[in-house]
UniProtKB/Swiss-Prot annotation:
GO terms for molecular function: ATP binding; ATP hydrolysis activity; identical protein binding. ATP binds at residues 11-18. It comes from Escherichia coli (strain K12). Keywords: ATP-binding, Cell cycle, Cell division, Cell inner membrane, Cell membrane, Membrane, Nucleotide-binding, Septation. InterPro entries: CobQ/CobB/MinD/ParA_Nub-bd_dom (IPR002586), MinD (IPR010223), MinD_FleN (IPR025501), P-loop_NTPase (IPR027417), ParA/MinD_ATPase (IPR050625). Its main location: membrane. This is Septum site-determining protein MinD. One of its GO terms (cellular component) is cell pole. It holds the Pfam family CbiA. Gene3D superfamilies: P-loop containing nucleotide triphosphate hydrolases. CDD domains: MinD (cd02036). GO terms for biological process: cell division; chromosome segregation; division septum site selection; intracellular mRNA localization.
Amino acid sequence: MARIIVVTSGKGGVGKTTSSAAIATGLAQKGKKTVVIDFDIGLRNLDLIMGCERRVVYDFVNVIQGDATLNQALIKDKRTENLYILPASQTRDKDALTREGVAKVLDDLKAMDFEFIVCDSPAGIETGALMALYFADEAIITTNPEVSSVRDSDRILGILASKSRRAENGEEPIKEHLLLTRYNPGRVSRGDMLSMEDVLEILRIKLVGVIPEDQSVLRASNQGEPVILDINADAGKAYADTVERLLGEERPFRFIEEEKKGFLKRLFGG
């Protein structure tokens, strides 16, 4: 049975698309047949981070409107076996996503034996976001350790509890996971950022990952490569840990303590 996981947040710029790409890639690396769908109609970015923007012929909206089949629109990732991308449309209005159309695409993906359907949601509560949230079995709430980001995430939790298909049908609630991104223990200790404990205290949902602030994320994005493929990057390692936890494995949280500087680093400001 496919698990539909929405990667969402209350505000933009927290690393949702980066996280969607990394998590989908990590699941596929674990042998899980995975598709990642870009729900951000008009602002297509997922294909850039996945490095497949030149291979986009048809998109999500083309499939919904009957202009292309799902097989025509799906892009098979060249680097990772078992991984497929369904890009968003750059040209159409956000109302092009209909509930019936999205439901049919998701049902067709399930019939194709996908084990994970990762939905990269736009920020906030616009049509694409509400559509992705509506159909989710699980939600990864992505937030920075900043007050405004955490507060907006709390609003998304309210929507998940009341406006999802599961809520409407009186089914088990959506399983909620917290993903903390751009975490910098040094800034936390200086009081510039909320601590992991602060965020957990406010949102009160289970922590699935802590992704450190890492220049490798920007470098990977610019190269069109999910950062999880960079096995030397701290962020890549943290995303790999996150995937393990999603699959039910226990993993200690890394990169949450301030690194102790040695004498020479302190002396020369390294």
